[in-house]
Every structure is written in C-alpha cells, then in structure tokens.
C-alpha cells in the first residue's frame, strides 16, 4: 500500500525573505491578476518558478521553463533557498473560516514524499478527469527545474489518528506561521525525530490514498517516473516489483545539525531512514486524514457563454421536460434575488437541484428521475446521483447542445468558486446563463474514487488550498 519517506526539503531562508511575500496559491488557481500581484510581492516569489510569464520572444532555448530553472538555481546559489541538513516530515495545519459562514475550522496534515503508483496498482485513486495540455506543461517544468515545488493533496483514512498524534501532540510551537490572502493561517512544524518519523511511516503502511487536489501533477510525476526508470534500465516488470514490494532501499544518514527544530530527534547515534529507490519514484505530498474534522469541499459553479440566441425563458420551458422548474422571483422587499438568496433557495431544496440564473429570470431546477434516466444509462448509479453529473449530461449537453469535447476545452464554460462572481459575469454580459450547484460530499468522492470511476472536471473544490513554497523536493 502507501509508502512514505522523509526528505531533505529545499526551503526559503526566513532570515533572507518575508515568507508571506514568497509563497503562492497552487499554480492552477492563480489568475493573471494574482500572477501580477505575486510578481510585485517579492523578487523571490515562487510564481517565477511555478507559473512564470511568457515572453513574445520565447524560443526553444529561452522560455518560461528555462527561466524557471535558472531562477531556482540562482536562488539556491544566493542562499535564498537552502536544503535542510537532514530528512524530516512537516506537520501542516490550516485554520480558516468556511466561506459564506462564520464557522472556524482547522485542517491538519503532514508533508512527506509519497511513492508514485499507477492507478492500476490500486494504491492511489483519482476522482477527476485530466487533460493532456495541462500535463505537458507541468512535465516541461519538472524536467527543466528538476524540482517539485508544489504538493499534491492526498486523503487517507485512519480512525485511530496515529500519524496526527505522533506529529501534533508534542505541544511544540510551530516553526513557521503565514496568513495568506484569504486570511487562512498556515502553520508548519518540522519533525526530525526518527522514532516519530518511523511511527508515522508505519501508520501509513496499510493505507490507500485518494487524490483531492493535484491530479495533473500526480499523473505528470508518474509519467516522469516511468521515463526516468527507462533511462536507468529498469524495465516495467522490475519497476512494478520495486514499487509493489518493500526492497532494501538506500538510506538517508541523519547527521546532527547545529540548530534545533520544534519537534526533533534526541541526541544519539545518527539514525537510518528509508528513501526512494530513485528520486523520481516519489513526489511531495500533503497527507490529510479524511476521518478528521476540518475538511471542506466547496461547489464549483458554472457559467455558459457564447450561446447564440440564448433566451432564459425558452430555456426554462425546454427544461420542463426533464426538471420541475420553479421561478425565483424578487424578494418581498422588491430587491432582485442576489447570490445569497439564490443559494438559500438551492440549499433549502432537498436532494439534487441547481439554479439556472439568466437575464430573463432565475429558475430552480429539480430533476424528474424518469425523464432524465435515459440520458444517464452509460453511467454508474453512483455517478448518476451526482448533481454535477446531471448538470453536465442533462443541462449542458442535452439542453444547451454542448458536447464533452467543447466542455473539456472550456470553449463555452467557465468555472467559478463564488456564486456572486457567476452572477456578476451574467449581469455584465460576459455569460448567458449561470448554474449554481451544491458541493460534492466527501462520501460521494470516496465512493466514486474507490470504484475506479471519475466525475466531470472541476467537480470538487477543496478549501483552503495548500500553499506553494513551504517546502520543495529537489531531484538532484
């Protein structure tokens, strides 16, 4: 099952930089405006590595990927980035307010290397589809930089909370605290005590993993692993044996360090801890126990644009064949129903439902099971019961006439976390219709994943995101 490793992370030297100014959200959540803000925040902001700006004069020899590699090497040479003196795991806690509420939650996990597996091994499970374009971009970056600067968000199940107890019950103060632009507090603890590390690794031995965020990076890393294995002369049979058994692996010597961290190994002889058979066989991941409180999944709303001749009332009439359609009128005070009111209507409706907001009116759609059943026959019962599946298959494809390829390419669809942003695009004329949906539940995601099925793209939005720049894994 899952195999984890401590590692000597490459990290920013907090005496050389303001940490708040150098970390970022994950690359695929960074808008052009956010990219500009990160560039302005610090000359050492990680944006220059994970999502640098393209230049009109870029060539095969000089481009966004070669600049990322040069930047990373320069920062290492300057001492802006330093490699840890010994392998460690990193406790990682995020304290945040659930969007749209006053509820405060804390999500706890830990950063380590995780051995890469093909999905066929049934150790790591996915829940969303991926796209070749996004993977080719990340592969080019990984090859140029020879570093993994962002974590993959992994879920596992452990009702005994063994790993969390080993990492977080020491009572030690975090060595790093950062509050991000969403007012999320991120705290990090370094764990170097080999006894604690071994306890955590052992606790994960029998676990399977679900990818919460980072499908493209995970699959790209797996591709890179296979390429590197071929270069090393490992055929597929040997590689499969290496990844599925527990061979004698090279060990990392934990030499003493001049400074002490928050959670450290005691004085004594250097300890031996396992390492991957070769660097590309593992990827940096954050592991979060799905049995613990603190996990939040937000909905990802959709707006459709470029629909020639679209009329909201004609759409509602057409939708009545498949849905019970209820128009949501102005509030008693006469105000137009905004995002908060529309979401209240949606969330007060039991079962599967979504809002179709148009410039001609806003409509609550609840499915007629007998009518939609013929459109879902090629899907499993689990997939059929997802709001997002019914939205895609019945509304986007059947009623709007879009197809899977155009949806995947984003030719007529945008994805938005905030319902207010979706309505703003509608009001400004940048969208023809906004679809507000309910979030996928953790139980639904788990069932889909473990049955080797997938959801439509952008089905889950785990909040908050893992910060990029807290730790990095270098392959050289």
Positions of PLM-derived features:
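Surface-exposed, charge/polar-rich loops and edge strands
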Residues: 1-242, 273-476
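A cross-taxon signal for low-complexity, glycine/charged-rich
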Residues: 241, 245, 249-252, 256-275
